[in-house]
């Protein structure tokens, strides 16, 4: 067990497939963990069992089951106007975090189990969004729900647009199909909000970011793996001074 510092605290988001932990010292994020189901036996609570914790769960595991001392955040805790009652708490927290760090208007592209786009307008109000199957989910669904199609991992480089085998045809659909969907939605966002910023986050962020590089100017978007943590931080201490987190820092924490 690590002796805690007095200003240390946890942020915790329990997702559909992973647990996301962050260790803060005051307002500074010092370490993160993104745990798969196989890794849950070694969660950070073993080393820091008595720290305060603020968090939320959108998965099947309740927050208190993972960390009994945790303060559970709800949608009602997020002062974001125009949210609908069934908006995913993870989406709301990520959007709230993006607003604190990057300002408005903003579109959060979360490339997780689902691929979601969540918007805030220039009045810092929730302005709608989109829910699509995640790119990994699309790949698995083709293999799981058809008799003859194989599982094809996400392409690591642009494939041929017109596949000449089953595998290359699926790879093309995953790559160019997802790119076309994102381009259509993000073009519409930037047409409506010319000063808007796009922030990419989530487990498949590297793949989605590669797609955005093919059609979106670099000054219109950035990457940030910690939007939910910024949102939790802002709810824990609304008066805290928020520092910027440029995209080159996203892999600083492990």
UniProtKB/Swiss-Prot annotation:
Catalytic reaction equation(s): (R)-pantothenate + ATP = (R)-4'-phosphopantothenate + ADP + H(+)
Keywords: ATP-binding, Coenzyme A biosynthesis, Cytoplasm, Kinase, Metal-binding, Nucleotide-binding, Potassium, Transferase
Disulfides per UniProt: none
Main location: cytoplasm
Signal sequence residues: none
InterPro entries: ATPase_NBD, Type_III_PanK
One GO cellular component term: cytoplasm
Positions that bind K(+): 110
Pathway(s) served: Cofactor biosynthesis; coenzyme A biosynthesis; CoA from (R)-pantothenate: step 1/5
EC number, as in UniProt: 2.7.1.33
Active site: 90
Binding annotation for substrate: 84, 88-91, 166
Reported cofactor(s): NH4(+); K(+)
Record-level Gene Ontology MF annotations: ATP binding; metal ion binding; pantothenate kinase activity
Pfam short name (any one): Pan_kinase
GO biological process: coenzyme A biosynthetic process
UniProt binding sites for ATP: 13-20, 113
Localization, UniProt: Cytoplasm
Comment on bound cofactor: A monovalent cation. Ammonium or potassium.
Domain of life from the UniProt record: Bacteria
Assembly, per entry: Homodimer.
Record function comment: Catalyzes the phosphorylation of pantothenate (Pan), the first step in CoA biosynthesis.
Family from the record: Belongs to the type III pantothenate kinase family.
Protein name: Type III pantothenate kinase
Organism: Thermosynechococcus vestitus (strain NIES-2133 / IAM M-273 / BP-1)
Gene: coaX
